[in-house]
Regions:
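Glycine-rich phosphate-binding loops of nucleotide-dependent enzymes
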Residues: 2-273
Length: 273
């Protein structure tokens, strides 16, 4: 099933300009005891593209994202972001560099409002110390106003204005996913890692999320790395796709190339899509 509106896909194909390599993954291997989660994985991501990572359950997709954003430390290989190569970086350091992440399992502050949850994504941008923030005086007050304005724009962009003061735990699952995306966008990332952003959604919710992802990529110029099980979504909105199976890379190319790759069809798709 195709979720991305035809006019959006056509606009993306005609006007979108893919840049140079912004993220380069080379020979990444990751093991947990005797279990090889990733085996010699290499691929790159270019500026302004939507890069999908697909594969069956247990293929190593989330492990790959965890290596990119510093949650896991691979035993072998390296990751280069904007020309800076790192092997052992923690999540905070990676976030400071300009990489944001959403997770398959939501980790929102359920008792806090939509506004405050998204505001928490601005923490890396805040320069005032905690005392000045609490007192809201001088530069700290001006800074908070600036950050709140940025968050309000994200709330408008995600069309959740009516819920801005609502505790996140009271929202339907699909709207909580939008808040999770909004918190990541609040970091103003250069690369956005999305781990199954449409999992558990109905068709209408998927349509909305597809539109938001395309607009983030198109209007903000944010590079997107996406894990998604819905092949209709992947084929519609991705520029390139890398395919993993049992921790190994078995395919890499455009959606059309992956669609017709015999190894991919055999291991994951079952039939041509």
């Amino acid at each position: 099933m195709s979720f991305a509106p035809h006019s959006v896909r056509k606009r993306q194909a005609v006007f979108k300009k893919i840049g140079a390599v912004i993220l380069d993954v080379q020979n990444i291997s990751l093991s947990f005891g005797g279990v090889k989660a990733l085996q010699d994985i290499s691929f790159n991501v270019k500026e302004h593209e939507i890069r999908a990572i697909i594969g069956p359950n247990g293929a190593g997709k989330s492990s790959m994202l965890n290596c990119i954003n510093g949650v896991y430390q691979p035993q072998q290989g390296s990751i280069t972001f904007r020309g800076q190569t790192f092997k052992h970086m923690n999540s905070h350091q990676v976030a400071v560099m300009g990489v944001a992440r959403t997770f398959q399992n939501l980790a929102l502050f359920k008792g806090m409002s939509v506004l405050d949850n998204i505001m928490s994504g601005r923490n890396l941008k805040i320069k005032s110390n905690l005392l000045l923030q609490a007192l809201r005086i001088g530069p700290a007050e001006k800074e908070e106003i600036m950050h709140r304005e940025a968050v309000e724009k994200i709330i408008d962009f995600l069309e959740i204005q009516a819920y801005r003061k609502t505790p996140v735990g009271q929202l339907p699952y699909g709207l909580q996913k939008r808040v999770d995306l909004g918190r990541a966008l609040a970091m103003e990332p250069q690369v956005l890692l999305l781990d199954e952003p449409m999992a558990g959604m109905n068709v209408e919710e998927k349509q909305d999320m597809c539109r938001f992802i395309l607009d983030v990529n198109d209007e903000f110029g944010t590079t997107v790395v996406l894990i998604e099980h819905d092949m209709g979504v992947v084929m519609d909105i991705s520029d390139r796709v890398v395919v993993l199976d049992y921790g190994k890379k078995i395919g890499d190319g455009t959606p059309e190339e992956v669609r017709n790759n015999k190894d991919v069809i055999s291991a994951y798709l079952g039939t041509s899509v």
